């Protein structure tokens, strides 16, 4: 991958920083693994906005990604190509299994076209192979981690994400996540070795507001720029600071307030995130 800083040939190009990957497939995606993806504009079935800042954007197809990798144990797969996926920050890899089936997976870092991957208890320890956590050596870097056996990957799926397996005790293993959180996960759960591809994603700069609109993201208006009827920070004569600690449009504390309320899984967290 290469970081390309564009020349300022126009105001919209002046601040553009691209991540260029020559290995990405330039043709169409694999059609049998595509599904229709409808735009909602952030509205529900009543036409009311339920999620702000959503609307417009380029038409997209959803790529069916295999997050489980539990029904092809022992079957070797060849990486046909690495592709761009508009639905996620990571790249995806198209696998051709020895039995003739093709599937998409999250592309691990360092995996390229022509590589051989395999899942199952007897899989060798190398990036891209999927095993149960009990079969992965302590100290290994993993991604695409399940929280429940057979449910599919839920942790460490975005670009550059990973976790480290730091301990094994009884039926649990302990993982250190990128956030600093240390968490216990059942050793029966699966994970993929290595870290997720496209780790340079955070270095890019879109350069202009229109590039956000192409991605379906609408503008965010500050509360202090609104009227009192629209936001708790609204109104006042001239420019104001809002007059109170930052809150959402509905009056809930924002900017750092704790929102986690899942007490059921608190026992699985060994150390909270930093």
From Swiss-Prot:
Sequence segments annotated as region (Disordered): 28-54, 224-274
Keywords, ordered alphabetically: Ribonucleoprotein, Ribosomal protein, RNA-binding, rRNA-binding
PROSITE patterns: RIBOSOMAL_L2
Gene Ontology molecular-function annotations: rRNA binding; structural constituent of ribosome; transferase activity
InterPro entries: NA-bd_OB-fold (IPR012340), Rib_uL2_dom2 (IPR014722), Ribosomal_uL2 (IPR002171), Ribosomal_uL2_bac/org-type (IPR005880), Ribosomal_uL2_C (IPR022669), Ribosomal_uL2_CS (IPR022671), Ribosomal_uL2_dom3 (IPR014726), Ribosomal_uL2_RNA-bd_dom (IPR022666)
Basic and acidic residues bias locations: 263-274
Domain of life of the native organism: Bacteria
Gene3D superfamilies according to UniProt: 2.30.30.30, Nucleic acid-binding proteins (2.40.50.140), Ribosomal protein L2, domain 3 (4.10.950.10)
GO cellular component: large ribosomal subunit
Biological processes, Gene Ontology terms: cytoplasmic translation
Recorded coiled-coil stretches: none
Job of this protein: One of the primary rRNA binding proteins. Required for association of the 30S and 50S subunits to form the 70S ribosome, for tRNA binding and peptide bond formation. It has been suggested to have peptidyltransferase activity; this is somewhat controversial. Makes several contacts with the 16S rRNA in the 70S ribosome.
Family statement drawn from the similarity comment of this UniProt entry: Belongs to the universal ribosomal protein uL2 family.
Quaternary state and interactors: Part of the 50S ribosomal subunit. Forms a bridge to the 30S subunit in the 70S ribosome.
NCBIfam families noted in UniProt: rplB_bact
HAMAP family: Ribosomal_uL2_B
The protein's name: Large ribosomal subunit protein uL2
Organism listed in the record: Pseudomonas syringae pv. tomato (strain ATCC BAA-871 / DC3000)
Gene name of the encoded protein: rplB
């Amino acid at each position: 991958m290469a970081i390309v800083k564009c020349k300022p040939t126009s105001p919209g190009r002046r601040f553009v920083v691209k991540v260029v990957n020559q290995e990405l497939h330039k043709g169409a995606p694999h059609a049998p693994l595509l599904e229709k993806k409808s735009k909602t504009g952030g509205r529900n079935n009543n036409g009311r906005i339920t999620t702000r800042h959503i609307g417009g954007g380029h038409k997209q197809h959803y790529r069916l990604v295999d997050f489980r990798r539990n029904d092809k144990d022992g079957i070797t797969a060849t990486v046909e190509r690495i592709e761009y996926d508009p639905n996620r920050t990571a790249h995806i890899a198209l696998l051709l299994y020895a039995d003739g089936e093709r599937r998409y997976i999250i592309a691990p870092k360092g995996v390229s076209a022509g590589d051989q991957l395999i899942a199952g208890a007897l899989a060798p320890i190398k990036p891209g192979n999927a095993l149960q956590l009990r079969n992965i050596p302590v100290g290994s870097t993993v991604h695409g981690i399940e929280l429940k056996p057979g449910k599919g990957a839920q942790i460490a799926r975005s670009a550059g994400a990973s976790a480290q397996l730091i301990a094994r005790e009884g039926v649990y293993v302990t993982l250190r996540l990128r956030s600093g959180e240390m968490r216990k996960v059942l050793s029966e759960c699966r994970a993929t070795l290595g870290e997720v591809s496209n780790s340079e994603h955070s270095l890019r700069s879109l350069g202009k507001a229109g590039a956000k609109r192409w991605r379906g993201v609408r503008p965010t208006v500050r509360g202090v720029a609104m009227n009192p009827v629209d936001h708790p920070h609204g109104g006042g004569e001239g420019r104001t600071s809002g007059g109170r600690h930052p809150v959402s449009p509905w009056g809930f504390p924002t900017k750092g307030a704790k929102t986690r309320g899942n007490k059921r899984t608190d026992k699985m967290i060994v150390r909270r995130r930093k």
